[in-house]
């Protein structure tokens, strides 16, 4: 039997079905963050966010994480990334691993919208976008 949960933020250890469009979001304009699974729901083990990117949009400036690994799955479009010294282009269905400590940036490398699902482990970094939302409230 399928179970549907309209408010996944209220769950901590129950099975979880996240409906399309569910979850909080922050819109940067040509780039957005949609929270799908929060660290509070996984005991801090991981978080999952959805990032739609408009064509030729930079997703993040060059940066690195000291505690998180990131795994990006390309749902649609062409995903470009600088991973250390390597520039990669990933098409629909491709996973891109960005290990902690590695300098990286990413962008939509195509002429059509690109969407990625990002798994962040351990959880916590998903709160960065929540912090941005508080200092940039006109983007909510």
Predicted regions and their residues:
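Residue-level recognition of well-ordered beta-strand positions that form the cores
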Residues: 52, 78-80, 119
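Short acidic-glycine-tyrosine-enriched beta hairpin
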Residues: 26, 85-103
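Extreme N-terminal tail/first-helix region
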Residues: 1-35
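A short glycine-rich, His/Asp/Glu-containing loop-to-beta-strand
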Residues: 22-62, 68-69, 124
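Glycine- and acidic-residue-biased ligand/ion/polar-headgroup-sensing regions
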Residues: 67-79, 84
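Ligand-binding loop in jelly-roll beta-barrel domains
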Residues: 44, 100-126
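Acidic/histidine-enriched, glycine/proline-rich intrinsically disordered or flexible terminal extensions
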Residues: 130-140
């Amino acid at each position: 039997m399928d179970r549907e949960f309209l408010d996944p933020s209220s769950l901590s250890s129950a099975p979880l079905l996240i409906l399309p469009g569910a979850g909080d979001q922050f819109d940067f304009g040509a780039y957005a963050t949609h929270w799908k699974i929060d660290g509070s729901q996984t005991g801090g083990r991981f978080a999952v966010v959805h990032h739609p990117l408009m064509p030729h949009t930079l997703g993040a400036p060059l940066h690195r994480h000291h505690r998180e690994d990131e795994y990006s799955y390309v749902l649609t479009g062409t995903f470009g990334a600088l991973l250390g010294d390597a520039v990669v282009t990933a098409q629909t269905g491709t996973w891109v691993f960005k290990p902690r400590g590695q300098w990286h940036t990413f962008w939509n490398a195509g002429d059509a919208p690109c969407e990625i699902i990002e798994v962040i482990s351990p959880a916590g970094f998903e709160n960065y976008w929540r912090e941005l939302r508080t200092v940039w409230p006109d983007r909510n």
